[in-house]
From Swiss-Prot:
<dbReference type="GO" id="GO:0005829">
    <property type="term" value="C:cytosol"/>
</dbReference>
<dbReference type="GO" id="GO:0005524">
    <property type="term" value="F:ATP binding"/>
</dbReference>
<dbReference type="Pfam" id="PF10609">
    <property type="entry name" value="ParA"/>
</dbReference>
<comment type="similarity">
    <text>Belongs to the Mrp/NBP35 ATP-binding proteins family. NUBP1/NBP35 subfamily.</text>
</comment>
<dbReference type="InterPro" id="IPR027417">
    <property type="entry name" value="P-loop_NTPase"/>
</dbReference>
<keyword id="KW-0411">Iron-sulfur</keyword>
<feature type="binding site">
    <location>
        <begin position="68"/>
        <end position="75"/>
    </location>
    <ligand>
        <name>ATP</name>
    </ligand>
</feature>
<protein>
    <recommendedName>
        <fullName>Cytosolic Fe-S cluster assembly factor Nubp1 homolog</fullName>
    </recommendedName>
</protein>
<feature type="binding site">
    <location>
        <position position="32"/>
    </location>
    <ligand>
        <name>[4Fe-4S] cluster 1</name>
    </ligand>
</feature>
<feature type="region of interest" description="Disordered">
    <location>
        <begin position="1"/>
        <end position="26"/>
    </location>
</feature>
<keyword id="KW-0479">Metal-binding</keyword>
<feature type="binding site">
    <location>
        <position position="246"/>
    </location>
    <ligand>
        <name>[4Fe-4S] cluster 2</name>
    </ligand>
</feature>
<dbReference type="GO" id="GO:0140663">
    <property type="term" value="F:ATP-dependent FeS chaperone activity"/>
</dbReference>
<dbReference type="GO" id="GO:0051539">
    <property type="term" value="F:4 iron, 4 sulfur cluster binding"/>
</dbReference>
<feature type="binding site">
    <location>
        <position position="29"/>
    </location>
    <ligand>
        <name>[4Fe-4S] cluster 1</name>
    </ligand>
</feature>
<dbReference type="InterPro" id="IPR033756">
    <property type="entry name" value="YlxH/NBP35"/>
</dbReference>
<keyword id="KW-0547">Nucleotide-binding</keyword>
Amino acid sequence: MSSGADVPSDAPAHCPGTQSDDAGKASACAGCPNQQLCATGPKGPDPAIALVRQKLADVRNKLLVLSGKGGVGKSTVTALLSRAMAHRNPDENFGVLDIDICGPSQPRVLGVLGEQVHQSGSGWSPVYIEDNLSLMSIGFLLGSPDDAIIWRGPKKNGMIRQFLTEVDWGQLDYLVLDTPPGTSDEHLSATTFLKGTDGSWGAVLVTTPQEVALLDVRKEISFCKKLAIPVVGVIENMSAFVCPKCTTETRIFPARTDGGGAEQMCIEMEVPYLGQLPLDPRLTKCCDEGKDFITEFPTSPAVVALEEIVTKVRQFFGDGKGERQ
C-alpha cells in the first residue's frame, strides 16, 4: 500500500506509488506518463529528506499558504502574514520561501524585485526585506521578471529541494511558504520534505467568498486531510469592500444566498475559520509598488482584521506571544 505523498498528482487510479516494488510494472501503470520513470527510478526514501531535516533544524515553525484557485490573493496574504508577524515580534526571525516556481510574485510584493542572491560558504543567502524578515524566490535567479519558466514536475521538485537544502536561513521562528494554486507537484514535494523535519508545521488556506472559489478550496482541504497536513485554518480574502470615506460595506463577491461563504464551509468540513480580510484598493497599489501596507495604512480595516488572524495563527503553533501586544 502506498502513502499519498508518493503518488504523483497525475497518476491513474490504483497507482501503487513511486516507492513500491510494483512501480511502473502494475497493471494500473499502463498508459501513465510516469510509467518509465517509476520502473527505472531508484526506490526508497529520497536522501534529500534527511538533508532538509538537517538544514531546517533551526526553523521552529513551517507554514504553507495554499489556495484551491488562482486569483484569490494567496501571495498577498503570504506577504501580509509574514510582515505582520515580523512587525509584531522584532525579536523573532521570519523567512518567506516562494515555491510558486512558474509564477513567483513575492519579490515584487515585498519590494525587492531586481535583487540578487549571493552565494556564501554555507549556501545561498536569502534577500532581506527587514532585519528579521528574509525571502528566497526563483524570481531572483531570472534574467528578467518577464522570463517564462517552462519546467516539468521533476525540475520543479529539484528546485524546491535546492531551496530547502542550500539556502542559509539561519535560525527562524517561522518559515512561510507561498505555493502555486491547486494541488500539484510543488505541493507534494514540499509536503514530503516538511513531514520529515522537526518542529511544527501546518497550512493556511485562502479563498474568496463566492462558491466557485469555495469549490476548489474544499478540494484543497481534502488534499490536506489525505496527506495529513495540519490545517491551521481558512482565511476569506476580499470578503467585502469598506469605503475609506464613509465606511459603508459592499459585498463585491457575494457568497451563496443560503448563508454560505468560507465560515459555513469551515463548519461543514470541520476546519478552523481564521477570519475575513476586507478588500482595500490601497493594498493592491502597495503590492504593485512593493510597499508595506501595514505601516502605510495602519488603521485600515484590513490591517485590523489581519492582526486578529495573526494572533490565531501563532496560537495554533502554541506560541505564547500570539496575543496582540
